[in-house]
Amino acid sequence: KCAFVLVKTSNPSSVELQDMVAGDRLVYKVMGDLTERLARDTAGKYGYNVLGVVVGATHPNELKDLRRRLEKSFFLVPGYGAQGGTAADVQYAFDRYGHGAIVNASRSIMWAWKKTGKDGLDYQEAARAAAEQMRDEICAYVTIV
């Protein structure tokens, strides 16, 4: 079992809180470090701690920084697709083996049928195609060992 801590979310307004300075550090870095400290020595069979972090695909620099700092944390990465996150952005969420992250896309998959010009009755085919395209795009940047 695992819980996820909101560290740097994908929404544009995340800067209002998560980029504030707390002491001499940004709040999102404080939250990342706190998550690491609280989860220390909880790594399971595959090496990840029981506390994961939520870091948005729309913040690739923060993803890169936090992945370096939180090697044993699992990353939940919202914001792919409709919010603007790309495969090039999310590559930084994965560890050196191509593991340790779940990339989430909702609207870009659920509403993929709108791009087909059809009535949406076959929405599942459009959703499947969008999910497969997402997978292929990410695999172009992430090597899984």
Functional labels for PLM-detected ranges:
Residues 32, 36, 63, 87, ...:
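Generic structural signal for well-ordered alpha-helices
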Residues 10-13, 60, 110-112, 117:
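Short, acidic Gly/Pro/Ser/Thr-rich loop/turn segments
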Residues 53, 57-104, 108-112:
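A C-terminal functional module that forms or caps the active site or interfaces directly
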Residues 1-51:
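Conserved anion-binding
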